[in-house]
């Protein structure tokens, strides 16, 4: 049986970052991707925002990896000529009753190490964005946008330069764990299906990470978290936008609210909303997601957007695209932290599961990759125990 030093399952932005990290550490690395191209799921269907790190509980993985990852990502974009823009973001209170929540958000961001936040009055916010309606706002200058496809191309390029190989049309079919021998036996599908043993495996399968974990014979099912999928639709603005910064309402249950984001060409889009899908079951066949945008959802978008942009014209929104967020808690539950589950948690040398890697996963991809590679390699297990 062929042996491979490291395998990454999933070629989204986090999986590619993990493969890059492992390959740059000198490990022979193979990336298994079930689709015919990299980054076709969550990594390609999001807001493409570089988050500052405002929203997450102090000392959570989301907070620490977002703040560290944001700095790493801006530097990576600069050195790899990836299109990006540090355009800034306004989080708005649209009534006096919301202003205490805005103050709490500023306090949370500062506790997380976001040191450039500015509280603005309504007049100060409108001086920056005249079309905005709010009673107060929080300016986050370090928030930005990035070409996610260009980012993934650069990550893959670095990984391949360091010796990694990407295997497309190669879904993981099954695996097995043997506590008595090192390594994890994996079997991949596709025309060139393989059976091999890997010393290090990072499960970066995103939406399907629980299914991948369930396919590993011998892995305790009790350690596989619940799996929920939250669909989010986006609508594009017809015509020019009057805004030069991102505009976010205060966060809501399940997401960050229907916000205004910009692409690198200056076109505006709005989203995502939250539509909970039927729960996928670990161990069951993967059903392909339905990414169609329901035009009937537009009415709710107009209502949400007009809270902070009352002048949004009628018939200005057109369906754009939808994405699906992997979650490990369901409707009504507080947002969960990233779950980076390594040998310190499950006792299986070399195996790391990445569960619930939703936003800010893109921002944090390089920091997540370092953490996951440390756990898979075992070189910094003490640090992982202390901070993971």
Swiss-Prot record:
Keywords: FAD, Flavoprotein, Oxidoreductase. InterPro entries: FAD-dep_OxRdtase (IPR006076), FAD/NAD-bd_sf (IPR036188). SUPFAM superfamilies: FAD/NAD(P)-binding domain. Belongs to the L2HGDH family. It is an enzyme of class 1 (oxidoreductase). Its cofactor is FAD. It catalyses: (S)-2-hydroxyglutarate + A = 2-oxoglutarate + AH2. It comes from Accumulibacter regalis. Its EC number is 1.1.99.2. This is L-2-hydroxyglutarate dehydrogenase. Pfam families: DAO (PF01266). Catalyzes the dehydrogenation of L-2-hydroxyglutarate (L2HG or(S)-2-hydroxyglutarate) to 2-oxoglutarate (alpha-ketoglutarate). Also displays some oxidase activity in vitro on L-2-hydroxyglutarate with O2 as the electron acceptor, but this activity is most likely not physiological. One of its GO terms (molecular function) is (S)-2-hydroxy-acid oxidase activity.
